[in-house]
Amino acid sequence: MTTVMNSTETGILGTCGIDADGLATDLDTMASFPYTDKYSDFVCGAWKSCAVWNGTGQGLDAGLDPYEGPAVVTDLGERLPYVRHLVGELFDLSLLKYGRLARLTPGSALVPHRDYLELDTNLIRIHLPLETDESCISSHNTTLYHMNVGEIWFLDATQAHSAVSNWTKDRTHLVLDFQADSLAACFTGEVQSPSIPSTHQVARQPVDREELAAFERAGILMDTTNYRDFLKIAIKTMFTRDITPDGVFDLLEGAARHSPAAARLDMIPPMRRYFLLARES
């Protein structure tokens, strides 16, 4: 496996000026796009995506399928002049491999996971929030934070990360994946070292062991039709209580042990490995 050696962690890299009218026009256009739910197993709720740049030029090819050469603008990307202009000003497009719109729908929660496990190479991931709210929270390992429109964020996708949306609209981000030897190489200008400022961080309450035990006891109600509802509650608990990504799966597995249908919930124990440790390509 080729690994990008940059010893960086998730954090804000800087800000960029946003043309509010240009962005609003593109957001209106995005609202009419078709989207794929290719990664639906990674979300409780809905995480819709489409490609703005990829290797095929097809907007509904939103996966990370390997290919040679730089990315091309897709049929959907051709309809987003402001987004293309903004990305072209900020980044070296010759190193871009994938550019996707990611829309996290109201009330949804991403399963804590690590990316690139199924690939032969690690990529460098950048997030540009396009439409969001303070009630949309992301996580990097055990740190919670919020990203604002006009900010440029590096996401260390090799580390456990998640997100929840408590907003009434879709949280929309542009997610860019670069194949480069360093983070700095992806940009046309200078960028600061990534960090998560304290002003962006979100506090959690200490773990209450009785609350966690009560969640597990509620597993008596779990069956094959609702185990992902339990998963969603466990994920959202990570955004209010001081538990780890591993702790989310501890809660789910603990609840499953209380279920009368435990023997039929054999899909639960492999989930920790699939999301956090290893996936086949």
Segments and roles (model prediction):
Residues M1-F91, L251-E253, R257, A261-E280:
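Non-heme Fe(II)/2-oxoglutarate
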Residues S94-L96, T105, T121-R125, D133:
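Short connector loops at helix/strand junctions that flank enzyme active sites
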Residues L101-L119:
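Conserved short histidine dyad/triad with adjacent acidic residue
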Residues V111, P129-V149:
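A short beta-strand-loop-beta hairpin characteristic of the jelly-roll/cupin
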Residues V111-H113, C136-S138, L155-D156, A160-W167:
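Short beta-strand His + acidic residue motifs that chelate non-heme Fe in jelly-roll/DSBH
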Residues I124-P129, I152-F154, T168-C186:
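A short hydrophobic beta-strand segment most commonly corresponding to one strand
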Residues V175-I233:
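Charged, amphipathic alpha-helical linkers/stalks
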Residues V207-E210, R217-S281:
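Sequence termini and other peripheral, non-core segments
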